[in-house]
Amino acid sequence: MSAATETEVREFQTEVSQLLDLMIHALYSNKEIFLRELISNASDANDKLRFAGLSDDSLFEGDSELTIKLEFDKEAGTFSIMDNGIGMSRDEVISNIGTIAKSGTKEFFKSLTGDQQRDAHLIGQFGVGFYSSFIVADKVTLETRKAGAGAEQGVRWISAGDGSYTLENMEKAERGTRITLHMREDEKEFLDAWRLRSIVRKFSDHVTWPVKMLEELPPAPPAKEGEEPEPPKTPEWETVNKASALWTLSKNDITEDEYKEFYKHVGHDFEDPMEWVHARMEGRMEYTLLLYIPGRAPFDLWDRDRRGGLKLFVRRVFIMDTSEELLPRYLRFVRGVIDSADLPLNVSREILQQNRQVEAIKKGLVHKVLGMLEEMLKNDPEKYATFWKEFGMVLKEGMIEDFANKERIAKLCRFSTTHDGERVPKIALADYVERMKEGQEAIYYVTGESFEACSSSPHLEIFRKKGIEVLLLSDRVDEWTVTHLTEFDGKPLQAITKGELDLSKFAGGEEEAKDEEAEKAQEEALKPITERMAKVLEGQVKEVRLSHRLTESPACLVGDAHDMSATLERLLKEAGQEVPTAKRILEINPSHALLKRLADEADEEKFGELTHVLHDQALLAEGGQLKDPSQFVKRLNKLLMG
């Protein structure tokens, strides 16, 4: 490298500067987490070296005892943490520390609210890691060398967290990373052995690598008269944490607080988990699992490139962060550890995707997670309601992805319905089936782009009048869910916006079932109107017919029984897919005053204007978009002015 590039001053990426500013303010009340974050990073560096060393033991450079060391200097006002892990090259320092090279960054900043407590949670989820140093330090120096690189390839990084950093080459004999924090004047409390030890034991007791500090020696006794004073003893490094893999211990030997703190380490979260399951699986496959459900949904839950939430170990050796290989996507919110006794140490992602043993583990993990949710639902419905609020929309994807567990997942799902009219989904499909009217053969549902669009749909009118419950499905995933969950408990799911509808066998209020002959007579009498309307709307609709589902609205649009729903059509088009626009059926309410006006309208131009407005209103009522809104407004104004 040329001398000109040996030392350089670089600007932080804009997002890093924003994050530093946000973090210092939002996390100040929880500032001791800086040590947990730095220990967690050091632990990851050791994990990576241990894994890389399986295939190239020269990377250990003759020292395979991996540790994390802490030291402080009260006089200098500094705290340092050292690991002898994988280390970083100059380019890696720039990409890992000078920029935020992770997906979901924009979504993260959009999700910040200004509420310190909520933002602290989000910042914690984002993974502040190294940047947490600036909560307590006004200057940070990082010195690192990549394992296997020459001593002259060391790198020094220095910043005061003010928008820029200095990068320079250095000689570094030992591989790994040393981070030195120049503590702020009001943060000198952390330059204390007892304080540091207590934080390590609180947050990092079960980090798998020994966290060491120099032992504290009592002052040497004064020399007796005429005797030489004793030479000062050299303090030894002593391990502060238990350095045991928590998941390998018996459940009876682990406290609730230890489970919670381990989650914060492995899940990179600041908050307690909602629930967890810890089990040792034996038989054909032997593995241990410790799985957690977070307290809140992460901001990047919908990001397909997000980091895996599971850490895979083989006989306590960390292999990789993974997710999809061991859990289906609909359980991507799960965090935790899997430790296999049977997988090879050199396992790769490709092997994971093709390995039968991995399939067996995956099946076992799904069984455990669904079992944990079933237990939560049974024993703590309030907690399950919180789970559903945070992760329900993702769990619904399981009915699409996991055919084997479709029924089991369906029983865990909660829905909004016309029964209580509440936005918060509380109703189970089993509850719906139990309340079905005598003679009701289908589970009825309506889909829409919002709860309001569903609950105010004109298609619901006859169902409300007859007291028949309807599921209100407004989550984006619902359109795909109902194409896969076609029945529940032997009852088919039926969209109320498609196909012919005959609810005449159900009386509603004082209404008696209509005589079939009377209905035919009414259809015949109104045939001239439906034919005139169909002519006006030629090319826009399949047909115009009398409705059996409207009681208040003048018209609605419906599809044939096997047509794609209007909502799904819109979603696919928004996703950039070419979807042929299906012509809908316009159903009109023969009892509505507007239909009587249409019947009396002799002026064909006015009849046409009224028909178009009626059609456009029906389209708007179901959440659709008009091709020509200005034309609709002109027609409406014209009719209003008589």
From Swiss-Prot:
Pfam families: HATPase_c_3 (PF13589), HSP90 (PF00183)
Keyword Ligase in annotation: no
Comp. bias intervals (Basic and acidic residues): 224-236
Location of the region described as B in the Swiss-Prot/TrEMBL record: 350-570
Region (Disordered): 216-238
Major site of localization recorded for this protein: cytoplasm
UniProt-annotated stretches for the region C: 571-642
Coiled-coil zones: none
Positions of the UniProt region annotated as A: 1-349
PROSITE patterns recorded: HSP90
Record localization: Cytoplasm
Top-level taxon of origin: Bacteria
GO cellular component, one term: cytoplasm
Record GO terms (molecular function): ATP binding; ATP hydrolysis activity; ATP-dependent protein folding chaperone; unfolded protein binding
Swiss-Prot/TrEMBL keywords: ATP-binding, Chaperone, Cytoplasm, Nucleotide-binding, Stress response
PANTHER family, per database record: HEAT SHOCK PROTEIN 90 FAMILY MEMBER
Family (UniProt): Belongs to the heat shock protein 90 family.
Biological role stated in the UniProt entry: Molecular chaperone. Has ATPase activity.
Subunit structure: Homodimer.
Protein name per Swiss-Prot or TrEMBL: Chaperone protein HtpG
The species this protein was found in: Magnetococcus marinus (strain ATCC BAA-1437 / JCM 17883 / MC-1)
